[in-house]
């Protein structure tokens, strides 16, 4: 009798193991693809920034990894800054400021940078690769990413709260 139950038990364990592995794989790919975007010309995606204000010191970062050199516009902030670069893009004042080593050596740069330009309501980026932007705020808000190129644009985004 035990020999008849053993194949059924093995079959059940194999099916359960297969179902768990397939479920984990589906979960992994669905989470991974949630941050990958391909936008057609003119299309937008909204990214929600929810700062962790319960902490004494908090910060939020936007990780933007562009998979091509197509132009996308980031809007939703008055000041954009690339982390650890000392570069501040002030949208309302239409200024690009490069901070100096000491606090007094700030330099205003022309709006003709190779991979980041100021526009009326945000910045347009056209670099290839990964950059991290400081998007810290005391209240939740939205960042809108719009494809302003004439071809599809692919990129990865993630907001990280520290």
Language-model features and meaning:
Residues 4-162:
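Acidic, Ser/Thr/Pro
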């Amino acid at each position: 009798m035990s020999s008849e139950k053993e194949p059924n038990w093995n079959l059940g364990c194999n099916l359960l193991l297969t179902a768990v592995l397939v479920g984990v794989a589906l979960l992994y790919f669905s989470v991974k693809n949630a941050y990958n975007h391909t936008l057609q010309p003119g299309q937008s995606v909204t990214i929600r920034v929810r700062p962790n204000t319960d902490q004494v010191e908090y910060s939020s970062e936007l990780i933007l990894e562009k998979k091509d050199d197509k132009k996308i516009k980031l809007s939703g902030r008055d000041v954009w800054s690339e982390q650890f670069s000392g570069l501040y893009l002030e949208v309302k004042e239409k200024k690009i400021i490069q901070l100096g080593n000491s606090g007094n050596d700030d330099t205003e740069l022309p709006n003709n940078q190779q991979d980041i330009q100021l526009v009326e309501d945000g910045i347009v980026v056209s670099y290839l690769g990964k950059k991290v932007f400081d998007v810290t705020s005391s209240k939740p808000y939205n960042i809108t990413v719009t494809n302003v190129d004439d071809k599809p644009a692919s990129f990865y985004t993630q907001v990280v709260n520290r």
